[in-house]
Amino acid sequence: MKIAVLGGTGDQGLGLALRLALAGEEVIIGSRDAEKAVSAAQKVLEIAERDDLKVKGATNAEAAEEAEVAILTVPLQAQMATLGSVKEAIKGKVLIDATVPIDSCLGGSAVRYIDLWDGSAAERAARFLEDQGTRVAAAFNNISASALLDITGPVDCDCLIASDHRDALDLASELAEKIDGVRAIDCGGLENARVIEKITPLLINLNIKNRIRNAGIRITNLPE
């Protein structure tokens, strides 16, 4: 499967690209700057210490056009501009949105959640794309970039997924479970992205409080 990681030069995108490439998928890292994307693809090969992985860099629009599914891994402030640049390219495809509405608190390193009129970043993306058949899922919001980039062990975190489209839920779940240690959790409709996205600032602040980098979440006692 060809997977575009849009805005994939940051830690979250790089980590997802790395893990999915290691799982045997064909990954295209996208960026506004194609040269940065090419450099990020090279970094994936260096971290993996392999030169046989199927990973390359391109502009966001080129990556989205070529891929079968796109994962959006940009800061909130870049979400809508990035979606605008790839809107035609992802027409009729599945978009997995990992955007989290957070901002740094003044005077400290802690982060806080930003309330959005649409309810969540994923719902905002879905409304922007709703007239062209793009199915949106919220996923990968709560998974630590540090854990993704540390390939010496599995990722100790569930992936909470929400979407109004069954095929998007299933595809996001399939990709999540290609990452060693990750279990996909079907959280229902996209409205639940409002809760999923709010967990991330809590995890980040727990990291800061406990001087760690990879706090995660597990949902217990679910049926197999």
From Swiss-Prot:
GO terms for molecular function: 8-hydroxy-5-deazaflavin:NADPH oxidoreductase activity; coenzyme F420 binding; cupric reductase (NADH) activity; ferric-chelate reductase (NADPH) activity; NADP binding; oxidoreductase activity, acting on NAD(P)H. Keywords: NADP, Oxidoreductase. Its EC number is 1.5.1.40. It catalyses: reduced coenzyme F420-(gamma-L-Glu)(n) + NADP(+) = oxidized coenzyme F420-(gamma-L-Glu)(n) + NADPH + 2 H(+). The keyword Transcription regulation does not apply. It comes from the Archaea. The keyword NADP applies. One of its GO terms (biological process) is NADPH regeneration. Gene3D superfamilies: NAD(P)-binding Rossmann-like Domain. Pfam families: F420_oxidored (PF03807). Optimum pH is 3.5 for F420 reduction with NADPH, and 8.0 for NADP(+) reduction with F420H(2). NADP(+) binds at T9, G10, D11, Q12, S31, R32, K36, V74, V100, A145. It is an enzyme of class 1 (oxidoreductase). SUPFAM superfamilies: NAD(P)-binding Rossmann-fold domains. GO terms for cellular component: plasma membrane. Catalyzes the reduction of NADP(+) with F420H(2) via hydride transfer, and the reverse reaction, i.e. the reduction of F420 with NADPH. Probably functions in the regeneration of NADPH required in biosynthetic reactions. Homotetramer. NCBIfam families: npdG. Belongs to the F420-dependent NADP reductase family. This is F420-dependent NADP reductase. The lineage of its organism: Archaea, Methanobacteriati, Methanobacteriota, Methanomada group, Methanobacteria.
